[in-house]
Amino acid sequence: MPININKFILDMERFDGTLKKYPEDFIVEEITPEGTVLEVGKEIGFEDVEKWHGSFIHFTVEKTNWNTMDALKQIVRATKTKRKNFGFAGTKDKFAVTTQRFGCFGLKKEQLENINIKDIVIRDVQKTNKKLRMGGLWGNKFTIKIRDLNLSEKEIKRISDLKLDYVLNYYGIQRFGLIRPITHIVGKFIYERDFESAFYTYCGTPINETGDSLEARQLVDMGEFKKALKLFNRGHDYEKRLIQQYLKYKDFKMAFTALPPQLNSMFVNAYQAYLFNEMINKRFDYGFDELEGDILEDNTPTGTLIGYDTKFSGGIQGEIEKEIVERENLDLKKFKIEDFGNFYGTRRKMVTPIYDFKSRFENEIFELSFKLERGNYATIVTREFTGNLS
């Protein structure tokens, strides 16, 4: 089951290169709703609110080779508080240098300022009366280095002259799984209420794995759950939770209640994203200028994230959306999934602008910098040059 990322904006011969050779090659700096870039290594000096009610604190986390959730676990442990007391505006990947705002409830500034965790820096601690919510950011600034290039002077000149103003608004590989792109497959099984297949796909089905992880997944596929538990390591906490819950209740649906609700929602969201990516592919041949029947956002045609309350476009875009629904044999009402969430369906632009795009070659390194609005993927931009998603 592919992830449906097939088309390109740039008409060019793509080049091989190494992305993310070092964490410092992929810098992600969060941009606040007010447009402030949380620059790496820089104090911003956010001002405390004048009349603080003693509730909320926001702070910037700069981290190297930490994803958002693992960094948060360490911060929770260091402050001796609970995960539910914290929030963040957006998630960031691991193998990178990233900045982002976190929010917390019921802590003192000193508790945060005194934290000492390897490769994590906390700064810009600010007293506020506002809760930081998911999505509470404008977007991100990316600075990306692609190494190990072997290009002629002519090729360098050709690529340096390219200008990229917008990109196809695909959901990136991160939505489906970097190592094992199976999140959307699990989501489809959950939509179909085939929780047994969802369980085996997530815990078994080895892809690109070796050693204990490979053997553990093979044991799951053979039904040897207790043996598999002994081989899954600390990086497979969710697989272990699923198996333990299944062994306790002997019910595949009940097993998924051991996972965080956000993760269970992400499975179905990934299936919706997979279908959306296919809409982009089918619309590509018609172009992305406005056509009769389009539903627009910021004067840009949108596609639907299919859910129980989906409103179809008219015209050609509507035909594309309905064709996918019919081919997948979807019953929209089934996107109300007990214990997993109600996936009502929304709309998303099929192309998205790139802001402040710059590129340069230096010492056989191709460096890109640009800004994207929240919910958009930098690897879709780099893919335009390299053809690779990771």
Swiss-Prot record:
Annotated InterPro entries: PsdUridine_synth_cat_dom_sf, PsdUridine_synth_TruD, PsdUridine_synth_TruD_CS, PsdUridine_synth_TruD_insert, TruD_catalytic
SUPFAM superfamilies, sorted: Pseudouridine synthase
Name this polypeptide is given: Probable tRNA pseudouridine synthase D 2
Keyword Repeat belongs to the record: no
Taxonomy, superkingdom: Archaea
Species classification: Archaea, Methanobacteriati, Methanobacteriota, Methanomada group, Methanococci
Family designation: Belongs to the pseudouridine synthase TruD family.
Domain (TRUD): residue spans on this chain: 166-353
HAMAP family: TruD
Class of the enzyme per the UniProt entry, highest EC level: isomerase
Record: active site: 93
Pfam families: TruD
